[in-house]
Amino acid sequence: MSLKIRLTRGGAKKRPYYRIVVADSRSPRDGRFIDKVGVYDPMKPKDDPARVSLEAEKIQAWLAKGAQPTDRVLRFLDAAGLAKRPARNNPKKAEPGAKAKERAAARAEKAGAGEDAAA
């Protein structure tokens, strides 16, 4: 049985409220779960301590048993210091694309030719 620590949605239309639960990965999002380990209320302000409420002992026990947190829950656990989220590093993201490199080279060449003519 593959266990996940994930969010289940509750609340009214356009007023979401999430429970953080441990569930079998094959069960539906809002279906049967094994244990409730916290809550997340996105309608509260970001600096409100009650926005995310976690039961640390239960979560650590489930992580020790092999439960895998989803990406969003892993963010909450990392913020609470219960789990470490690996750093994402994409050095090529800031690098300009091929066309931008061509334009920059053409601009530099044109500027170099203009300086030679002025000298």
From Swiss-Prot:
One of its GO terms (molecular function) is structural constituent of ribosome. Residues 92-113 have a biased composition (Basic and acidic residues). InterPro entries: Ribosomal_bS16, Ribosomal_bS16_CS, Ribosomal_bS16_dom_sf. Residues 81-119 are annotated as: Disordered. Coiled coil: none annotated. It comes from the Bacteria. It holds the Pfam family Ribosomal_S16. The keyword Ribosomal protein applies. PROSITE patterns: RIBOSOMAL_S16. One of its GO terms (cellular component) is cytoplasm. Gene3D superfamilies: 3.30.1320.10. Belongs to the bacterial ribosomal protein bS16 family. This is Small ribosomal subunit protein bS16.
